[in-house]
Regions:
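Short, membrane-interfacial amphipathic segments enriched in basic
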Residues: 1-32, 210, 215
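Membrane-interface helix starts
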Residues: 25-51
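Active-site cofactor/substrate anionic-group-binding motifs, chiefly glycine-
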Residues: 41-94, 98
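Selective transmembrane-helix segments that form parts of the transport pathway or gating/packing helices
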Residues: 42, 46, 50, 90, ...
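Hydrophobic alpha-helical transmembrane segments that constitute the membrane-spanning cores
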Residues: 52-55, 99, 136-165, 198, ...
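Membrane-interfacial helix-loop-helix connectors in multipass membrane proteins
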Residues: 63-87, 154-197, 205-224, 246-248
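Short cytoplasmic-facing helical segments at TM-TM junctions of multi-pass membrane proteins
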Residues: 111-135, 221
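Final/C-terminal transmembrane alpha-helix of multipass membrane proteins
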Residues: 221, 227-243
Length: 248
């Protein structure tokens, strides 16, 4: 029963994506909605990304210094491990998990409300491809802005680590700088950005599917928002394993 239901949901998702990825009929209207979605989904999320990244970067640096530093290890190890954790996992995977809660529920509730208030039906009656009109700008908008959020997250996390060095005196700024620069591999930054593009697609497309497919009333809209966040989070973790293996 569970397998058959999952296959049906999987098929409906691909059918919706087939309708979504078509050439927009009115490019000017599409660009207007595309820019609006970039602002609503991405720019409005910058503050929470910066706040979380700053404090997580500080906490990681403190934990690394306290728990793995020893007289037999170089003093720059804390800075090195902080950089690797921020670049490889936190700024892409964990940050996208956090954004799936904010952005995913936003998308699902918006489209779900439009469905139960028959706004999507009105678009269909007017001959508009509602999936393309409503969903495609969200997917492309989030995929466009997500790499910038990853870069901001990495930079802010490192600033948080410097905060512990200058204010908390956990380690010297010189040792932290030496660790941040040690054996730096630029590919790790590109890998983080590539992973974030996949995660942005998962968040926007899955949340759009659950919101667009709502049947019922306001209770079902809330349930769709919850299902969208849960499913997006699971798929992000699942795909992170394969993307890390492929890109490493």
């Amino acid at each position: 029963m569970f397998i058959s239901k999952s296959l049906v949901t999987f098929g409906r998702y691909f059918m919706l994506m087939g309708r979504t990825f078509s050439i927009p009929e009115r490019m000017r209207m599409f660009m207007k909605r595309y820019i609006k979605e970039m602002s609503q989904l991405g720019v409005d999320s910058i503050l929470i990304v910066l706040l979380i990244s700053f404090f997580i970067g500080a906490v990681i640096c403190i934990q690394m210094k306290i728990n793995i530093q020893s007289p037999w290890m170089p003093r720059w190890v804390s800075g090195y491990t902080t950089r690797e954790i921020m670049l490889l996992e936190f700024s892409s995977s964990i940050m996208c998990l956090i954004l799936s809660g904010k952005v995913g529920s936003n998308i699902a509730s918006e489209l779900g409300t439009m469905r139960v208030t028959q706004q999507i039906d009105a678009l269909e009656i007017m001959g508009v491809n509602s999936a393309n009109y409503l969903i495609l700008p969200k997917i492309l908008g989030l995929m466009t802005i997500m790499p910038f959020l990853v870069i901001f997250s990495s930079a802010t996390g490192i600033l948080g680590a410097y905060g512990t060095a200058y204010i908390g005196h956990i380690l010297t700024p010189e040792d932290l700088t030496l660790g941040l620069q040690h054996s730096f591999n630029p590919w790790f930054m590109y890998m983080s950005i590539i992973k974030s593009l996949f995660f942005a697609f998962i968040i926007s497309s899955v949340s759009s599917f659950y919101g667009y497919s709502v049947e019922g009333g306001s209770v079902e809209v809330g349930k769709a928002s919850t299902d969208a966040v849960v499913c997006s989070s699971v798929l992000i973790l699942f795909s992170d394993v394969f993307l890390t293996q492929i890109l490493s």
